């Protein structure tokens, strides 16, 4: 079976599962394991790595920087800027600090982490300057809802936004009402963070759901793999789960070979229905 690929900016094709790094870099005793997991993921073809200056206050970027040693050219590297750094010289300084921690001289993609301190015009201008300086190749956004995207799209250069990274999983389908169809219409990929839901009752409910486990049994895979396969079954959607161990990253990579049938997708739809109306954008 052919692996599912996602097009970024029309010029880069990447596997529909990438590697997230939220919570990496917080525990020094886990660093070697985290680096090894990221490197294993790269070798398995999970070549997009997503990080942020926020994660572990820059610690996750340092872990990624170590993992990239000798492998930088194989990787599509994504980082994110705090809203209060996303304009003017602050954006230049923040990007340069991320590059130092990542031990690289460019990012493939730089995202506004969420909207806030700067007007979109200022953020777009800063992103364009960073591209001109060769520090980033593309820019995008995260945690922007449909109305935000309409506002961004009206600005000069706003339609150069390469992606929107949002929370999306079987138990949180709000983006399917208007945001996801609009992104698909623009042929702009959506990066799904927390594709297995955040830890706690919601995630446990998804992983223990009878329908999810029936499908897992039919494919001889785990419930978590079913949830990931569901996310990437949607046109133009990439999942970026975190895997802190090599075994976990191997399971994530295997999802690229899983194809849920239309009947199985219908069963999951019935268990966790799509929204009938507009809901506020979920974010964590």
From Swiss-Prot:
Pfam assignment, any one: Aldo_ket_red
Expression induction or repression: Expression is not significantly altered upon methylglyoxal addition.
InterPro entries tied to this protein: AKR, NADP_OxRdtase_dom, NADP_OxRdtase_dom_sf
Protein name: Methylglyoxal reductase YeaE
Keyword field contains Lipoprotein: no
Enzyme class: oxidoreductase
Source species, domain of life: Bacteria
Enzyme Commission (EC) number: 1.1.1.-, 1.1.1.2
Keyword terms: NADP, Oxidoreductase
Lineage: Bacteria, Pseudomonadati, Pseudomonadota, Gammaproteobacteria, Enterobacterales
Family of the protein in this entry: Belongs to the aldo/keto reductase family.
Protein's GO biological process: methylglyoxal catabolic process
Reaction catalysed by this enzyme: hydroxyacetone + NADP(+) = methylglyoxal + NADPH + H(+); a primary alcohol + NADP(+) = an aldehyde + NADPH + H(+)
Described function: Aldo-keto reductase that contributes to cellular methylglyoxal detoxification by catalyzing the NADPH-dependent conversion of methylglyoxal to acetol. It also exhibits activity with glyoxal and probably plays a significant role in detoxification of glyoxal in vivo. Can also use aromatic aldehydes such as 4-nitrobenzaldehyde, 3-nitrobenzaldehyde and benzaldehyde, and phenylglyoxal.
Effect of deleting the gene: The deletion mutant shows sensitivity to glyoxal.
Keyword field contains Transport: no
GO molecular function, one term: oxidoreductase activity
């Amino acid at each position: 079976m052919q692996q599912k690929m996602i097009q970024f900016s029309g010029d880069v094709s990447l596997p529909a599962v990438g590697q997230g790094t939220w919570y990496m870099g917080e525990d020094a005793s886990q660093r070697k394991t985290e680096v090894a997991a990221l490197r294993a993921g790269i070798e398995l073809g999970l070549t997009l790595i997503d990080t942020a200056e926020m994660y572990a206050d820059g610690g996750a970027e340092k872990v990624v920087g170590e993992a990239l040693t000798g492998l930088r050219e194989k990787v599509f590297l994504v980082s994110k800027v705090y809203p209060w750094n996303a304009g003017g010289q602050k954006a230049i300084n923040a990007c340069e600090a991320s590059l130092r921690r990542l031990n690289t001289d460019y990012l493939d993609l730089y995202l506004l982490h969420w909207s806030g301190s700067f007007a979109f015009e200022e953020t777009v201008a800063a992103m364009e300057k960073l591209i001109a300086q060769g520090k980033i190749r593309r820019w995008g956004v995260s945690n922007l809802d449909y109305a935000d995207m309409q506002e961004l799209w009206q600005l000069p250069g706003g339609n150069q936004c390469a992606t929107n990274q949002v929370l999306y999983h079987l138990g949180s389908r709000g983006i399917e009402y208007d945001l996801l169809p609009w992104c698909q219409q623009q042929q702009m990929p959506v990066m799904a963070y927390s594709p297995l839901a955040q830890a706690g009752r919601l995630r446990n409910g998804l992983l223990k759901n009878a329908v999810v486990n029936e499908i897992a049994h039919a494919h001889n895979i785990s419930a978590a793999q079913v949830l990931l396969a569901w996310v990437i079954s949607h046109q133009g959607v990439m999942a970026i789960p975190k895997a802190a161990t090599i075994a976990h990253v191997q399971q994530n990579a295997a999802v690229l070979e899983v194809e849920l049938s239309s009947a199985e997708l219908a069963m999951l739809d019935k268990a966790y229905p799509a929204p009938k109306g507009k809901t506020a954008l979920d974010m964590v």
